[in-house]
Amino acid sequence: MNKLFEQRMQKLLQNDYPAFESALNQKPIKSFYLNPLKHGSIEHLNSAFLTKHPYINDAYFYDYENYQLGKHPYFNCGLYYIQEPSAMAVANCLDFDHDDYVLDMCAAPGGKTCFTASKLSSAGLMIANDINKLRAGILSENVERFGLQNTIVTNSDPVKLEKYFNNFFDKIILDAPCSGEGMFRKLDQAVETWSIEKVNECAYIQRNLINSAYQMLKDEGILIYSTCTYSLEENEDQVKYMTNDLQMELLEIKKQPGMASGYQNDKVVRMYPHLNKGEGQFIALLKKHTNGSVSYTHLRAHETLRHL
């Protein structure tokens, strides 16, 4: 493992570092959640290989070495979605209203999109966007398999989306591209490609995405900002930018089992493999306040989307 990364994590975790290092040598955990739109259930699954998730309804951990749920016919029918446990916690940290207009900015492969859109009614709208054409194709497949009728997949640069969705969304999910430190146990490539230069490059990209998200968020709208990395540059430093420069209000996230507070910040969430059944994750909730300085018209979806 990269020595600089080790030094940074030792400074961050202090006495918890040995437990964290040990957890990196253990096998990752897999999980899934049921599709409420198709009345998914575990009735016809082998419950011997399943463990109920402690705080997410209709979600389960499973023994992937002995039970290949990704090859089960129910998966191809969209009765459940397989998602990494910590990533599943992101969209679960906020309650969505049935008629919310929601944007998932960097949505592929679609776990957060499907989880959220299944909670919306026909009065709500989910725009699931990914700038990468190949990943947007995978996103479309997962949205179709899940049976979402209130979801539109776009393949666009968020800067372009700003022109059509200014002050439009009630809630935005920004699971930002990151240096992937939280995936070291799961992906060898994340370990091999890590560098401090990559951390700084990702932080720059994230800042631009945050600015786009702010423009597209309604007054009093809420942004879920998340990454699967540990660096302060990509997490708490970005939150400071949003609260100080953009004057957004940082909301406190209710801590669930396995969630830790952020670095010198009790309102955000950090997740580590030695504390929960999942990989690394950072989550923050922020509300936009413009004090009436920004006016907007909540356009009907088809009037806006026809220009994309």
Question: Which positions does each model-derived feature cover?
Answer:
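Glycine-rich nucleotide cofactor-binding entry segment
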Residues: 1-168, 200-205, 249-271
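Conserved Class I S-adenosyl-L-methionine
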Residues: 236-254
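Mobile active-site "lid"/loop adjacent to the S-adenosyl-L-methionine
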Residues: 134, 174-209, 224, 228-235
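Conserved small/polar residues in nucleotide/adenosyl-binding loops
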Residues: 297-307
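A structural alpha-helix within SAM-dependent methyltransferase catalytic domains
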Residues: 117, 207, 211-214
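Core SAM-dependent methyltransferase catalytic element
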Residues: 273-275, 280-292
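Helix-to-beta-strand junctions that scaffold the AdoMet/dcAdoMet cofactor pocket
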Residues: 121, 217-218
